[in-house]
Amino acid sequence: MVFTSHKGVKRKSHHSQLSVDDVPKKIPLFKKKISQALKKASTFERQKLVRRIKNCRASEDADTLGRFEAEFEFAKQFDFTKFVDYCYYKKILKNKDFRKLLNENLHVDFPADLTEDAQRNTVARILNSKQLSDAIRNINSILEKYLRFLNPDLQELSDKKAVSSTQKPIKTIGKVDLSNKSTSNQDQVDNTHVQNSTDGVNQDTGMILDNTEDKEINKSMSYSMKNEGVKESSLQNATLINRKSIIDDEMLEIPLGKHNNTNLPALTAGFLDPVESDDEFVEKELEEVDIPKRKNRRGQRARQAIWEKKYGKGANHLIKKATEERSIREERQRKYEERQAKRAARENAFTEHQTPQKPEQLHPSWEAKRKQKMPSSAAFQGKKIVFD
């Protein structure tokens, strides 16, 4: 039996390939992601409002304090998951390709009736939050991958755009053949071709030849034509030569920059404010983002070591520790004394209530035996007789 090794051979996947009908099944997942982002953004908003309320109370700013308290009460009671369908429609289904891919014809109006400024400000900050923007951006990237997978043509186009954007080509104008053998028709064709190419280069390279330079060339050539009687065809050829000499100069060769498809955050990942977007609180939020973060504070042990070197035994944590140990010892001694007092009281009560016991009567046989032993143990009594 011959065994053949299949090392390095990739197994074929038994999963069915993705089809257009599978993409709409992801809609509940997308809405779930949007709902989670809204809940997270509302939590962060409440935390920010709590900090602002504390700062206002410290600075005793009554007007701002009342406004922040109203916003906090609204953020605490309102259910921001009502905006899930609205965000899904406003930021995802606005793309025609995504709408066709998801097979959705949904239209959602703004779901809340906001009458107060505090409500509008809170909703605007949450709908423009970073958490919701990141969730929308992730969903858009997933749908773009589906589009590229289901439409290979789009993948090829995107690859070509990526290659063209990464390269830095330098556009130059082709050489113009101005030989005497060319006919007037060929000259006209070449002239139009070169003019079109120069126009394209001017548009791509940021207008290499300015309008002022064109005017100066035309003026000089028209002046020479009037004085010397030069033909119009030769004038056109001369202008082309001047243009070519200017463009072929190395100092005027400007490399093309990257033509990246830059998408504005407000159009791809952010959220257009359904209410007033020029709110002063939104501007303050943007200013707070640029504040540098402070360094991490020292640990508790490190701070205590510094206090011990600075204050010695008078450090607060040492005093607190000594008082706690003293209170523990006093509590232990008090409980011991209470136990001793209870034990002594119990012994006294037992001795007071105890009745004297009568002597037990022995059995007659034991009584006779006891009496028999008594004389033997008694001391010798009598007179000593001495014999001579």
From Swiss-Prot:
It holds the Pfam family BUD22. Residues 174-206, 318-388 are annotated as: Disordered. GO terms for biological process: maturation of SSU-rRNA. Residues 319-349 form a coiled coil. This is Protein bud22. Residues 179-205 have a biased composition (Polar residues). The keyword Coiled coil applies. Keywords: Coiled coil, Nucleus. Belongs to the BUD22 family. GO terms for cellular component: 90S preribosome; nucleolus; nucleus. Residues 321-350 have a biased composition (Basic and acidic residues). The gene is bud22. It is found in: Nucleus, Nucleolus. Its main location: nucleus.
